[in-house]
C-alpha cells in the first residue's frame, strides 16, 4: 500500500519522467548511491517528490542552509498535504559554544537562545518518525549532530487508556520523569497542570492542542483533546500516546546508570591529573563535574548536559553517536536520504567534525570537561556517507565525489518543463566593465526586467551600488551580515520592482528563484578561486535561466580553465534544450507565479486593526480581533513565516494595552 499521497496539478514533463524512472529503478535495485544532475529551473524538487512517492520509504532531505530548508519544507508540505512533512534545523536563535583560550587563560561560557517554535518542530519530527512511516523530514546539518537514544525515548513514552488503573500521584511523577514541568500559571508547551482529579498536558511537540486526562480515584475515566487557543473540546479519545518533552529524556534506571558512569570516569580523570601533577586542572574538573552531578541527581538535568550524552545513551567511547538517522532507521526500517545542492552540502558536512573536535579537545586537556565530552559530536564524514540507507545526491553541478559514488546510477534533467533554455553568455573586457554594464542595465530595465550582479569583494559591491545609484539606477546590495529574514525581504522587494538591480558576492547562487531576472553580470570572472570556480560560475549563470531573455555577461581579461568548462557545459545543455524544443514545437516562455502567492503576503489582519480607531473600540470587538490575530499568528509561526508572526504578535500586544 502506498505510504505517500503526492498532490500536483501537473504531470512530470521535460526530462522529469525519464529522470524519475531511472532513479526509482536504481533505488528499487538497492543501489546505495545515485545522483540527479538537474539544471536550474528543471523541477528537481518535483522529481524528488515523485521519487519519494514511488520508493515508498520515509525520507530525509538535507540542505546546507536554513533558507533552502524553509523553501523545501513549504514545497513538500504542498506536495504531500496528507502526509507528515517535518522540519529539523538548529533550534538556536543564537549559539556561543563554551571554549577556552590557553594563551589568554580565557574561558568563555556557553551562551545560547533557543527558538521555541524550532524546538517544537524538532520534537514533532522525532515523534513522527517513532510513530509513523509516512514521514518526510527536511533538515539542515543539524541532522548530523547528536540526539538521545531513540529506544530509550520509546521506553519513556506513555500510552494512556480510558479505564486503566493508575495511581494519580505516580502519574504526575511520571510526567516529570518525561521532562514535563508542572505550571499552574503559564500553561504552554512541555508543561502540565493538575486541578482536582483533572490533569491537563500540553505536549512539547504540539502548540495547537492539549490533552485532558480525568481521573476517578485511581482510574482514568476520560481523555479529551482541547484547542489550545479557544479552550474548547475538539474530540474524545479511548487512548493517547504521549511522548517525552525532550529527545534526551531517560528513565530512572538509565539515569542512575549514567550518574554512576560519570562518577567512574571522573575518578579516572582525576587520578590522571594527580599523577601529572596538574592540580589546577584537577580541582577545576572536580568542582565542575561534582556540581553537575548534584544537579543531575536532583533534577535530571544540568547546564551543558549534552557533554555527558555518551553516559545517558549507553554508547562506548569513540562510538558513533545517536542522531536523526537512528530515528529514521528505528526498527531496522529502510529510508532514503536526499542531499540537495550536494556540491555545497557534502563539503560542509565533511568539515563539521574537525572544528568541533579542536575546540573540545582544549576543554578536556585543561580540565573543563571529561573526555566523554568529545563523544558529543557531529558525525564524521565517513560515518555519514556509509550510513545504512540509500542516498540520492541532487545538484546542477555535482562534485567528483557524488559521481564516483553513484557510478552509472546518474540521471540528467536538462530539459525544463517550461521549455526555457540555459542563458546565452558573452565575455567582455573588464577594463570598462562598470560603464559597459550600465548601458546593458538600461536596456534590461526598459523591458521591466531585473539584474543580478556578482562581485568579488564587499567593498566593490558597495562602490558599484553607490556609483549606479548616483547615475540614477534603483540598486541595492546584499552581504554576509544580512540575516535570512532581511535577505528574503530584499529579494521580495526586487521581485516587486521596488528596485531593479541587486548586487552581491556569494549570495546569488543556489536556491534563488527569480523569473524576473534576465541579466546576470559576473565581474572579474577571470580571477580564479572559490567564487569563480567552474561550479560557482555555472550556478551563478543559472540565475538567468528562469527568464526567456536570460543572458550572462562575464567581464574578464582572459578565459580561465573554469570559465571554459562552464561554457562547454552551458553550451551542451542549451543545444540539447533547443533540439528538444524544435522537435516538440515549444516556444520558451518566462513563467512567473503570482507574487501574492509566492511571497505569502499576509497583511490583511494588521491593516484591519490599524484602520480601526482602537481606543474607541468596544472591548468585545477588540477581544474578537485579538483572537483572530492570535490564530493567524500561530498559523504563520507554524508555516515558518516568523517575520509576519512577529508583526502580528506586536499588534496583539498593542491592542491588549488599550
Swiss-Prot record:
Domain statement: The beta-hairpin motif is involved in DNA binding.
Keyword set, alphabetical order: ATP-binding, Cytoplasm, DNA damage, DNA excision, DNA repair, Excision nuclease, Helicase, Hydrolase, Nucleotide-binding, SOS response
GO molecular function, one term: excinuclease ABC activity
Protein name: UvrABC system protein B
Domain Helicase ATP-binding: 25-178
Cross-referenced CDD domains: DEXHc_UvrB, SF2_C_UvrB
Domain UVR: 623-658
Binding site for ATP: 38-45
PROSITE patterns associated with the record: HELICASE_ATP_BIND_1 (PS51192), HELICASE_CTER (PS51194), UVR (PS50151)
Location of the protein in the cell: Cytoplasm
GO cellular-component term (any): excinuclease repair complex
Positions of short motif Beta-hairpin: 91-114
Chief place where the protein resides: cytoplasm
Cross-referenced InterPro entries: Helicase/UvrB_N, Helicase_ATP-bd, Helicase_C-like, P-loop_NTPase, UVR_dom, UVR_dom_sf, UvrB, UvrB_inter
Residue ranges occupied by any Helicase C-terminal domain in the UniProt entry: 433-607
Family to which this protein belongs: Belongs to the UvrB family.
Subunit structure: Forms a heterotetramer with UvrA during the search for lesions. Interacts with UvrC in an incision complex.
Protein's GO biological process: nucleotide-excision repair; SOS response
Known function: The UvrABC repair system catalyzes the recognition and processing of DNA lesions. A damage recognition complex composed of 2 UvrA and 2 UvrB subunits scans DNA for abnormalities. Upon binding of the UvrA(2)B(2) complex to a putative damaged site, the DNA wraps around one UvrB monomer. DNA wrap is dependent on ATP binding by UvrB and probably causes local melting of the DNA helix, facilitating insertion of UvrB beta-hairpin between the DNA strands. Then UvrB probes one DNA strand for the presence of a lesion.
Amino acid at each position: 500500500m502506498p505510504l505517500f499521497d503526492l498532490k500536483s496539478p501537473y504531470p512530470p514533463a521535460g526530462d522529469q519522467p525519464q529522470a524519475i524512472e531511472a532513479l526509482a529503478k536504481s533505488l528499487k535495485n538497492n543501489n546505495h548511491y545515485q545522483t540527479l544532475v538537474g539544471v536550474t529551473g528543471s523541477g528537481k524538487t518535483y522529481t524528488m517528490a515523485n521519487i519519494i512517492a514511488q520508493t515508498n520509504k520515509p525520507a530525509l532531505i538535507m540542505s546546507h542552509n536554513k533558507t533552502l530548508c524553509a523553501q523545501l519544507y513549504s514545497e513538500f508540505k504542498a506536495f504531500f498535504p496528507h502526509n507528515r512533512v517535518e522540519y529539523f534545523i538548529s533550534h538556536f536563535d543564537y549559539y556561543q559554544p563554551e571554549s577556552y583560550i590557553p594563551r589568554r587563560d580565557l574561558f568563555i561560557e556557553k551562551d545560547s537562545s533557543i527558538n521555541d517554535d524550532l524546538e517544537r518542530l524538532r520534537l514533532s519530527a522525532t515523534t513522527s518518525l517513532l510513530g509513523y512511516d509516512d514521514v518526510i523530514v527536511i533538515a539542515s546539518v543539524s541532522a548530523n549532530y547528536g540526539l538521545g537514544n531513540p529506544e530509550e525515548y520509546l521506553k519513556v513514552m506513555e500510552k494512556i487508556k480510558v479505564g486503566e488503573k493508575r495511581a494519580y500521584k505516580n502519574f504526575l511523577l511520571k510526567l516529570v520523569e518525561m521532562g514535563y514541568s508542572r505550571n499552574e500559571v503559564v500553561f504552554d508547551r512541555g508543561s502540565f497542570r493538575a486541578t482536582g482529579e483533572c490533569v491537563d498536558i500540553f505536549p512539547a511537540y504540539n502548540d495547537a492542542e492539549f490533552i485532558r486526562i480525568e481521573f476517578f480515584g485511581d482510574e482514568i475515566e476520560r481523555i479529551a483533546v482541547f484547542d489550545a487557543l479557544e479552550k474548547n473540546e475538539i474530540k474524545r479519545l479511548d487512548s493517547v500516546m504521549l511522548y517525552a518533552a525532550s529527545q534526551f529524556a531517560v528513565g530512572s534506571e538509565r539515569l542512575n546508570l549514567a550518574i554512576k558512569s560519570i562518577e567512574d570516569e571522573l575518578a579516572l580523570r582525576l587520578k590522571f591529573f594527580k599523577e601529572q601533577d596538574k592540580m589546577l586542572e584537577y580541582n577545576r574538573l572536580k568542582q565542575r563535574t561534582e556540581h553537575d552531578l548534584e544537579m543531575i541527581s536532583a533534577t535530571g538535568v544540568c547546564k551543558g548536559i549534552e557533554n555527558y550524552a555518551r553516559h545517558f545513551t549507553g554508547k562506548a567511547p569513540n562510538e558513533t553517536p545517536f542522531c536523526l538517522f537512528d530515528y529514521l532507521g528505528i526498527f531496522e526500517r529502510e529510508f532514503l536520504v536526499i542531499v540537495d545542492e550536494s556540491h555545497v552540502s557534502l563539503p560542509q558536512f565533511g568539515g563539521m567534525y574537525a572544528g568541533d573536535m579542536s575546540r573540545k579537545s582544549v576543554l578536556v586537556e585543561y580540565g573543563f570537561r571529561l573526555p566523554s565530552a568529545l563523544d558529543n559530536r557531529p558525525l564524521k564524514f565517513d560515518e555519514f556517507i556509509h550510513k545504512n540507507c540509500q542516498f540520492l545526491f541532487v545538484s546542477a553541478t555535482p562534485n567528483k565525489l557524488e559521481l564516483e559514488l553513484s557510478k552509472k546510477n546518474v540521471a540528467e534533467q536538462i530539459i525544463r518543463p517550461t521549455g526555457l533554455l540555459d542563458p546565452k553568455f558573452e565575455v567582455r573586457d573588464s577594463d570598462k566593465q562598470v560603464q559597459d554594464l550600465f548601458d546593458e542595465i538600461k536596456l534590461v530595465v526598459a523591458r521591466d526586467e531585473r539584474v543580478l550582479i556578482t562581485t568579488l569583494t564587499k567593498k566593490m559591491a558597495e562602490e558599484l551600488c553607490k556609483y549606479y545609484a548616483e547615475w540614477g539606477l534603483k540598486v541595492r546590495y546584499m552581504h554576509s551580515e544580512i540575516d535570512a529574514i532581511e535577505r528574503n525581504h530584499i529579494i521580495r522587494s526586487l521581485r516587486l520592482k521596488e528596485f531593479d538591480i541587486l548586487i552581491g558576492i556569494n549570495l546569488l547562487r543556489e536556491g534563488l528563484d527569480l523569473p524576473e531576472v534576465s541579466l546576470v553580470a559576473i565581474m572579474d570572472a577571470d580571477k580564479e578561486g572559490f567564487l569563480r570556480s567552474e561550479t560557482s560560475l555555472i550556478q551563478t549563470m543559472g540565475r538567468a535561466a528562469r527568464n526567456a531573455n536570460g543572458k550572462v555577461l562575464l567581464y574578464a581579461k582572459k578565459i580561465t580553465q573554469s570559465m571554459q568548462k562552464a561554457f562547454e557545459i552551458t553550451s551542451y545543455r542549451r543545444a540539447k534544450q533547443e533540439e528538444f524544443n524544435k522537435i516538440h514545437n515549444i516556444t520558451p516562455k518566462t513563467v512567473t507565479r503570482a507574487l501574492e502567492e509566492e511571497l505569502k503576503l499576509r497583511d490583511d489582519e494588521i491593516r484591519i486593526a490599524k484602520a480601526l480607531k482602537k481606543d474607541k473600540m468596544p472591548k468585545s470587538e477588540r477581544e474578537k480581533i485579538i483572537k483572530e490575530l492570535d490564530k493567524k499568528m500561530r498559523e504563520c509561526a507554524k508555516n515558518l513565516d516568523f517575520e509576519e508572526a512577529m508583526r502580528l504578535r506586536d499588534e496583539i500586544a498593542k491592542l491588549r494595552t488599550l
